[in-house]
């Protein structure tokens, strides 16, 4: 690959904040991070809103200790961005989702859960004490926790905010989501039970997907125990994807459903050898891209664990996705789901 800007591999890793040890451990990383090295620092800085509100389970990587202290993932994305031409604004405030506010950004990134139209204030959780001042246990011996002081508020975006956000993507705003971004705004009648994994269907037989799920391209069903699994890069040309080809590492892998027929699959979940009934299915999309009218959409189910965020490969894929959704690089995202994962739908499970 040509090095048009004159930035060598080691220099770019330094720019990304990735040290020499990572360079040694990841000899295949160059193409992932040099997918369009000339875009780093070239032209106007792209503005990205990183939204990490949790209306459901809040993951540790996006948990703040206080309102003003950024979480682990927020710190990393901000740092990667500042060194690569992206100005990242982090927020958990859904009330900001107005047309005027969203117009300030080139792209929006989600690490979210649940119904984001609702408020979801966060409290410090403390052990519940008995009359003697000792922590109480449940019948399984686990310490019972209760709400303590309010740490910060997470206002909902409301129906108007959700509509403004979806319109922004439709009209050309870039969008990407990590991990539980697929555990957000579920379709009507969303089931977690393994026996009810077919598409959500209304009484008249028509699919009733939430418009957010339609935009994203699929939704979360359930996950099993964290375990190693293999990914396959079915589009190694997507910036950062080749580094994950045949990679095996531990993560909280999502079992997904309701895949859009126009997905351009980038990485597939290789299910052979995985433990748990939710994974006894044929390979299915794990990372993908698609177009929502004028908007570029990217999703990866990775990102539960801190050590995954710490991987230089994950930084490379994230930056590659940011460059694509903000129009800095052009990638062929012709739909390929039928060719690369023909039995991805849950009804085709083993």
Residue ranges of model-derived segments:
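C-terminal segment of N-terminal export signals and the immediately downstream linker at the start
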Residues: 5, 28-51
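N-terminal export signals
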Residues: 11-33
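Extracellular ligand-binding/catalytic regions of CAZymes and related secreted enzymes
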Residues: 41-45, 52, 72-73, 83-86, ...
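Catalytic beta-strand/loop cores that center a nucleophilic Ser/Cys/Thr
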Residues: 43, 210, 214-293
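Structural recognition of the beta-strand scaffold that forms the well-ordered cores
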Residues: 49-52, 90, 107-112, 174-178, ...
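Solvent-exposed loop/turn segments at secondary-structure junctions
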Residues: 54-57, 94-96, 113-117, 175, ...
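Glycine- and acidic-residue-enriched helix-capping/strand-helix junction motifs
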Residues: 56-74
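A glycine-rich, often tryptophan-bearing local segment used as a flexible ligand/cofactor-contacting loop or short
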Residues: 118-242
